[in-house]
């Protein structure tokens, strides 16, 4: 029974975004970064980008045993490792530290940018509310094995517009995070996501906690709120306002779109900061 339980729940808790989402976020970040860097030595080459994106996608999509025993949720408490029945590592922090160490010790170009891709994978996942709150996403008895936010499509045109063509925002990201390490990037990205979850839903007497409800203990798992695991879908739940007994969000509601766009923008921003950090080291600056 224990083995069956671990098999069922472990397979669905390991990662947030799937490979194609990670790849798209990575390519957007590299394109904007390269466009805004004047020094040719600081730009990512096609080969470096390929190593980074490939490792990122493989970490998201592959590895039965990795997915079974590492769930990679964020610990908002003290960021120490947590386990389930001394078998399953439920938090990502120890594994992330190992990846950063591997990156720092990398000798070959292939190892260096592959390890960067694995680090970036975790940074991007910190824009997934269910992985930061965190909320355990498995509902296998309902044939529901993931958080629906993680499947929400990326609006690439909107991201391009928000990042801008004049490089002011990208340059600001690079400058502002010049002394920011990968561990701090992880924490800052997670904190931004958690603050967004606690933010108001425009026009409704609720915060986004109606979807992902944190536990009062920051070291414990939260749960789905009154709206359930229905991000992006039509959903209705009891309102706090007696004149409007039901709050309703529609399929692909503009409120969903704006929330997702902000999270995806933050994923691109933290990716730019991470790859800029490695490129500075490579260039010796």
Can you annotate each of these PLM segments?
Residues 1-9:
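Bacterial N-terminal signal peptides
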